Every structure is written in structure tokens, then in C-alpha cells.
């Protein structure tokens, strides 16, 4: 049976992640309170941030920026938006 969590991002009960996605306390916190669906949304958003901001993941500053954005996305005021991104019109 799947592990269920109350997802802080979606504000509903949903299937939890199989393992902490990051090392350390942030990874544990995400594992305990973020659903697979919300994590998939973060991965898409993270990809946009990397591409639009031309982040070099070999650069420590870029990795630190993404860690801060991860925490803001789930537990703060929301992550930065990609500078060139325009959301699709809602139907």
C-alpha cells in the first residue's frame, strides 16, 4: 500500500514520495509532507528555472539557489518564476 501524506503544496491527502529526494533536513521535511504529484510539479518548475536562468549545475551557487527555491516552493512564499515564462491561459 502506498504511503499517504498531507501534502503542504496541494493541501490534500496524496501518495507520498518513496524516499527523501534530497539529503539532510530539507529532504526529510519534503519526504514527510510533499506528495509525488507536488514533487513532479517542482521538477518541472526547477527545469524551467535552470533553463531560463542558464544555471550551471556544476556551480555551487546555482545548486544553493535551487535548494533555496525548493524550500520556498514548498514551505515559503513560493519560488521565483522563470523570467521568460508566460503561463498558458486557463480554460
Curated annotation (Swiss-Prot):
Family per record: Belongs to the Fe(2+)-trafficking protein family.
Gene3D superfamilies: Fe(II) trafficking protein YggX
One of the protein's GO biological processes: cellular response to oxidative stress
Cross-referenced InterPro entries: Fe_traffick_prot_YggX (IPR007457), Fe_traffick_prot_YggX_sf (IPR036766)
Keyword Iron assigned: yes
A GO term, aspect molecular function: iron ion binding
Entry GO CC: cytosol
SUPFAM superfamilies registered for this protein in UniProt: YggX-like
Assigned keywords, A-Z: Iron
Protein name, entry field: Probable Fe(2+)-trafficking protein
Function summary: Could be a mediator in iron transactions between iron acquisition and iron-requiring processes, such as synthesis and/or repair of Fe-S clusters in biosynthetic enzymes.
Pfam family membership, one: Iron_traffic
PANTHER family recorded: FE(2+)-TRAFFICKING PROTEIN-RELATED (PTHR36965:SF1)
Source organism (scientific name): Ralstonia nicotianae (strain ATCC BAA-1114 / GMI1000) (Ralstonia solanacearum)
Domain of life from the UniProt record: Bacteria
Amino acid at each position: 500500500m502506498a504511503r499517504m501524506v498531507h501534502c503542504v503544496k496541494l493541501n490534500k491527502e496524496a501518495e507520498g514520495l518513496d524516499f527523501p529526494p534530497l539529503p539532510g533536513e530539507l529532504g526529510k521535511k519534503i519526504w514527510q509532507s510533499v506528495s509525488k504529484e507536488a514533487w513532479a510539479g517542482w521538477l518541472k518548475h526547477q527545469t524551467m528555472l535552470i533553463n531560463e536562468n542558464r544555471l550551471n549545475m556544476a556551480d555551487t551557487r546555482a545548486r544553493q539557489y535551487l535548494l533555496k527555491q525548493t524550500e520556498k516552493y514548498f514551505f515559503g512564499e513560493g519560488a521565483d518564476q522563470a523570467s521568460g515564462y508566460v503561463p498558458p491561459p486557463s480554460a
